Amino acid sequence: MIPPSQFLDHIIRPVLSAFGVVQPRLHTRAAEQLMLGTALKESGLQDLVQRRCGPAVSMFQIEPATFDWVWRQVILERNPRLGAALGRFLFQGIAPADQLAGNQHLACGIARIRYWTVTEPLPAAGDVEGLARYWGAHYQTDSIPAQMREWVRLYEVHAEECFR
């Protein structure tokens, strides 16, 4: 497992900081907590490709259809300034879709923008159960209580100390 504090400091915070210049509500403490909890639950901060040969990739387990929708409809068509902020993290000469598994800055940005499209506001920072419910309702295809409990458990074991 990548140490959660390193993932937070070197992946999540730089991306959210760049986004925060364009749209301040994209970089909040609650957003940092949501993103770290999401990566912990989705991949255990270790799997770049989905277990059991599914299509999702990156520490945030983003499926190609989700990437395409966020990239084309949310970034390119409606938020070019946000696209420019995310562009700082792209590798030149490689199509963005082909970078998703290995470029965790890009994956973090796509995941955060995916959450941003939700009209319901983020729960408060420190509301771990609320963040887990938010993940279950807006990132997962099914809001399964056992999965949300596991999100909370992983967060409490691996991420809580990052925010003290």
Residue ranges and their predicted role:
Residues A18, V22, K41, R114-V118, ...:
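Structured segments of extracytoplasmic/periplasmic soluble domains
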Residues V118-G126:
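Inter-helical turn/loop segments and adjacent helix faces that build the functional surface
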Residues M1-P24, R133, A137, I144-P145, ...:
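Ser/Thr/Pro-rich, acidic low-complexity intrinsically disordered regulatory segments
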Residues I75, Q147-Y155:
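Short, polar loop/linker segments at the starts of domains and inter-domain junctions
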Residues T28-G37, G126-Y134:
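Alpha-helical scaffolds flanking conserved acidic
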